[in-house]
Curated annotation (Swiss-Prot):
This is CyanoQ. InterPro entries: PsbQ-like_dom_sf (IPR023222), PSII_PsbQ (IPR008797), PSII_PsbQ_cyanobac (IPR017487). It comes from the Bacteria. Belongs to the PsbQ family. CyanoQ subfamily.
Length: 152
């Protein structure tokens, strides 16, 4: 009977020592590095950015169409190359780190709203409303480009 108690006591002591060692171990020496962009992400972002900038060249054509009140051409540009540009912007946003996504995502939504305002100007046959939407779109697009993180 005495022998059984010693075994129980030794088991309890070993359990307490193990618990103390595990509890006082602290954080591991190898903490993960801060999140950064992988080479694949950088390549994807640069590819999307190149396509975005290429399609953005059509802003000048949109401005002319709006000024003329050529609503069919304006809509074709917004739904064609500038619509593709919006899709590329959304794809680029998904490739950004979570901390870098909020501003570009909000500006992409704002740009979509600006295009809707141009479309509303076309529905109303109002060059003034459409031009206001165009100016807002141009400003939001420039802000979008400036909001993207520097990639090295």
């Amino acid at each position: 009977m005495l022998r059984l108690n010693r075994k129980s006591l030794i088991s309890i002591l070993l359990s307490v020592v193990a618990l103390i060692l595990v509890g006082c171990g602290g954080p591991s020496a190898t903490t993960p590095p801060p999140p950064t962009y992988s080479e694949l992400q950088i390549t994807r972002i640069q590819d999307y950015l190149r396509d975005i900038e290429k399609n953005a060249e059509r802003f000048a054509d949109l401005e002319v169409s709006v000024a003329k009140g050529d609503w069919q051409e304006a809509r074709n540009i917004m739904r064609g190359p500038l619509g593709e540009m919006l899709m590329d912007m959304r794809a680029l946003n998904r490739n950004l780190l979570a901390k870098d996504q909020p501003t570009p995502t909000a500006l992409t939504r704002a740009l979509t709203d600006d295009f809707l305002k141009i479309d509303q100007g076309a529905d109303l046959d109002s060059v003034t409303v459409a031009q206001e939407g165009f100016r807002e779109a141009e400003a939001d697009f420039k802000a979008y480009l400036n909001s993207l993180p520097e990639l090295s």
